[in-house]
């Protein structure tokens, strides 16, 4: 009896959730200084509030760039296509499509890290800048490591499937 690719279902469901969150981020509007004016009135230091507003706007504009939109839409399409292949029990094509998604997700993590680094320079306080840089680096590293782990799982399972197929063919030849 052939094993079910539970690993791929789990990975694709997690990736579909992440893609849905990214698509929602594209739909949300870019904030303006006026819409974020309540930060200044919340008792926060005025300089920090202005820098935080500028940082938030810059990061959101970067997230709404054409390149990022293409990355997000392509990743969502790849997840849907991989799910369709999986439902149709074409595991090999689902694996290859998912590998394409993972490489695209790694590219997206790097692109977002570069965009945040540009926005971090808006903070004048070195402690705040360092905190924002650490958050950006941590987020990028987490995203890349997570995707590399997903990639390793898929490659390992593909290798095992190929090994089992080869062993089954050898047994047929001997019989």
Predicted feature descriptions by range:
Residues 1-36, 153-166, 173-175:
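Cytosolic juxtamembrane helix and N-cap/initiation of the first transmembrane helix
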Residues 78-112:
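Loop-to-transmembrane helix junctions at the membrane interface
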Residues 106-175:
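Alpha-helical transmembrane segments of multi-pass integral membrane proteins
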Residues 17-24, 77-81, 104-110, 149-156:
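Alpha-helical transmembrane segments
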Residues 33-65, 111-141:
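Interfacial non-cytosolic loop connecting adjacent transmembrane helices
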């Amino acid at each position: 009896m052939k094993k079910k690719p539970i690993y791929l279902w789990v990975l694709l469901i997690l990736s579909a959730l992440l893609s849905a969150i990214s698509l929602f981020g594209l739909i949300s509007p870019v904030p303006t200084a006026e819409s974020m004016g309540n930060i200044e009135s919340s008792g926060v230091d005025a300089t920090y509030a202005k820098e935080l507003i500028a940082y938030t706007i810059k990061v959101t504009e970067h997230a709404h760039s054409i390149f990022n939109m293409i990355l997000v839409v392509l990743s969502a399409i790849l997840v849907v296509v991989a799910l369709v292949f999986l439902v149709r029990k074409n595991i090999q094509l689902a694996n290859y499509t998912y590998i394409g998604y993972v490489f695209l997700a790694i590219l997206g993590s790097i692109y977002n890290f570069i965009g945040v680094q540009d926005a971090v320079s808006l903070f004048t306080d070195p402690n705040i800048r360092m905190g924002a840089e650490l958050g950006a680096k941590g987020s990028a590293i987490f995203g890349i490591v997570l995707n590399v782990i997903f990639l390793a799982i898929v490659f390992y399972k593909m290798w095992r499937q190929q090994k089992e197929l080869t062993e089954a063919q050898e047994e047929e030849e001997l019989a």
